[in-house]
């Protein structure tokens, strides 16, 4: 029953926000398998992130008021004083080093509140969608993020393109991220304890979810 702040998983699966309509799925819904993924010893069914979005999630969790307005306010405030973090990314026999505003690892095309950063992500395709927003000036940053939200296209991860593209969007079944500056981490929108290395891997057909 979608009763959270963003309800990203429910939106991705087409589950109604109305509680009574969502309850109808117990009798009329389809129990379909969806993927999940591991982040070291933790579990995620939707997405996790390092850097900017995780910083906002940590601040949001301790804020006196909740809701979309508070989240937007915190996002805007942090956008105008961005921190770029050093990361190493290993996937598909490729290794890159970069300075990035954030990295999102998505199993769902929903971040919450109908906002997406990985528009090609699917709950049941056996793949993780990884978005790396590399260091750039604020004007380019805003334009590139809006372009990614509207029409992000999946790239092939390579050493030639890894830190050259301002936004890198690729898919993988597993990856490892080194995080030497301990950029903050969120898992499914909730603040989580970060680590200097994160091993991330898809779990195909992890559980069944009642959906329309």
Task: Describe the residue ranges of each PLM region.
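Short glycine/serine/threonine-biased micro-segments
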Residues: 2-4, 12, 47-49, 110, ...
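Glycine-rich phosphate/pyrophosphate-binding beta-alpha loops
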Residues: 49, 104-119, 191
């Amino acid at each position: 029953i979608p009763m959270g702040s963003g309800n990203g998983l429910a939106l991705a699966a087409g589950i109604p926000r109305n509680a009574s309509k969502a309850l109808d799925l117990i009798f009329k819904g389809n129990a379909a398998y969806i993927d999940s993924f591991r982040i070291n010893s933790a579990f995620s069914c939707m997405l996790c992130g390092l850097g900017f979005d995780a910083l906002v999630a940590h601040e949001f969790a301790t804020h006196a008021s909740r809701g979309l307005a508070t989240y937007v306010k915190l996002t805007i405030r942090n956008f105008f004083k961005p921190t770029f973090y050093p990361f190493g990314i290993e996937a598909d026999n490729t290794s890159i080093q970069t300075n990035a505003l954030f990295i999102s690892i998505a199993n769902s095309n929903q971040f919450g509140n109908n906002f997406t950063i990985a528009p090609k992500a699917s709950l049941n395709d056996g793949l993780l969608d990884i978005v790396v927003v590399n260091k750039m000036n604020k004007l380019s940053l805003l334009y590139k993020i809006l372009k990614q939200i509207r029409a992000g296209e999946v790239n092939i991860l390579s050493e030639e393109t890894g830190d050259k593209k301002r936004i890198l969007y690729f898919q993988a079944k597993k990856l490892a991220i080194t995080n030497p500056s301990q950029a903050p981490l969120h898992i499914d929108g909730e603040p989580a304890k970060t680590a200097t290395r994160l091993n991330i891997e898809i779990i195909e057909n992890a559980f069944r979810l009642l959906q329309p």
